[in-house]
From Swiss-Prot:
The name this protein goes by in its record: Imidazolonepropionase
Originating organism: Xanthomonas campestris pv. campestris (strain ATCC 33913 / DSM 3586 / NCPPB 528 / LMG 568 / P 25)
Pathways per UniProt: Amino-acid degradation; L-histidine degradation into L-glutamate; N-formimidoyl-L-glutamate from L-histidine: step 3/3
Subcellular location as annotated: Cytoplasm
Described function: Catalyzes the hydrolytic cleavage of the carbon-nitrogen bond in imidazolone-5-propanoate to yield N-formimidoyl-L-glutamate. It is the third step in the universal histidine degradation pathway.
GO BP term (any one): L-histidine catabolic process
Entries under Pfam families matching the protein: Amidohydro_1
Length: 401
């Protein structure tokens, strides 16, 4: 069999084991043709392979490229001053009353043109790529007007032309009520004007909504889901982060790809997600940064068979995090997730959360050849160590980059 590229003398995390674990292979090879894996597995079982380019991995570990399935990466402005204010005792309400909070990011994002927004976002993207990310989702939600939401989505797509990475854009117009607007009037505009325009221009694959007492009600979230479905867009939700609004169960009834945060999720929501195949996306960075104490119901989610993904939730207000490796450590330390669970959360299950489980997140024939090659002794090193980046090579669609 001929192939473009062959990586050999490697240890593999295939993420393709029947038991749902890492699918480790001690002496493995990965063969790629035209950006697609044609063989991944034990060297002893490989067919005869003739490669144009051969890489001796010298016993390094190869995993699928990491997937960050929940980010708000495209925004302008800096809210480090709010962090200082909170450390000095200011409340979120006091900061918001002084013009801070999400309104500050909305103001800065609206004021930035495409070039400025791109320049602000590229370093954050590069930080993710430096730790092995090959696919990421980017949400809008800091424009809150049709023009500015489209600007964010346009910049998200432009990022993918400047770096070797797959960007999955999500429309999050229902992130917050913009200053001076009335909630229901704004949601009507999201559903009647913004979603049709975003869909017509092909700017997003999915629609997200922040369903919470300080954002949008379940009834308003359902209105968004109906509009999304009518325009052929997938559904996601920020749910049960601060209280149980039963948003995850609602989203599951609409076949949502994922429900994210879910600290206050109840058993009915878990059951609904399990029945719908909706992925739980856990966001330990936000949990850590906001000093939350309400743990997501991980044992119950596992027992119900709900897939558990992880993400950085990169955003300026509650998770200014651009390190998937640190997010794994946070998930292990704060959520008591296993090493296997942390790694599957940023690979196989993250792919499912983006509707890409059929082509990303595993090493097997037919999958896209997105790889992360690591200088580590064991997979646990990816989760155990902090401030440590052992990435040797990132491979996107068969090309080392």
């Amino acid at each position: 069999m001929h192939c473009d590229v062959l990586w050999h003398n490697a240890r593999l995390m295939t993420l393709d084991a029947g038991d749902g674990g890492l699918g480790s292979v001690d002496d493995g090879v990965v063969a790629c043709q035209d950006g697609t894996i044609v063989y991944a597995g034990p060297a002893a079982d490989a067919p005869p392979l003739q490669a144009s380019h051969v890489h001796d991995c010298q016993r390094r570990w190869i995993s699928p490229g990491l997937i960050d399935c929940h980010t708000h990466l495209v925004y302008a402005g800096n809210r480090a001053n709010e962090f200082e204010q909170r450390l000095r005792g200011a409340s979120y309400a006091q900061i918001a009353a002084a013009g801070g909070g999400i309104v500050a990011t909305v103001r800065a994002t609206r004021a930035a043109d495409d070039a400025a927004l791109l320049a602000a976002s590229l370093p954050r993207l590069d930080a993710l790529l430096a730790e092995g990310v090959t696919t990421l989702e980017i949400k809008s939600g800091y424009g809150l007007t049709l023009e500015d939401e489209i600007k964010q989505l346009r910049v998200a797509r432009q990022l993918a032309t400047l770096r070797q990475v797959e960007v999955v854009p999500t429309f999050l117009g229902a992130h917050a009520v913009p200053p001076g607007a009335q909630g229901q009037t704004y949601i009507d505009a999201v559903c009647q004007e913004m979603i049709p325009a975003v869909a017509a221009q092909g700017l997003a694959e999915a629609v997200d909504v922040f369903c919470e007492h300080l954002a949008f009600s379940p009834a308003q979230a359902e209105q968004v889901f109906v509009a999304a479905r009518a325009h052929g867009l997938q559904i996601k939700i920020h749910a049960e982060q601060l209280s149980n609004q039963h948003g995850a169960a609602l989203a599951a009834r609409y076949g949502a790809l994922s429900a994210d945060h879910i600290e206050y999720l109840d058993q009915a929501g878990i059951d609904a997600m399990a029945n719908a195949g909706t992925v739980a996306v856990l966001l330990p960075g936000a949990f850590y940064f906001t000093r939350d104490t309400q743990l997501p119901p991980i044992p119950a989610l596992r027992a119900a068979g709900v897939p558990l993904a992880l993400a950085t939730d990169c955003n300026p207000g509650t998770s200014p995090l651009t390190s998937p490796l640190l997010a794994m450590n946070m998930a292990a330390t704060l959520f008591r997730m296993t090493v296997d669970g942390c790694i599957t959360g940023f690979t196989r299950e993250a792919a499912r959360a983006l509707g890409r489980g059929n082509r990303l997140g595993r090493l097997r024939a037919g999958m896209q050849c997105d790889l992360a090659i690591w200088d580590i002794d064991a997979p646990a090193d990816l989760v155990y160590r902090m401030g440590f980046n052992p990435l040797h090579t990132r491979v996107w669609r068969g090309h080392p980059c």
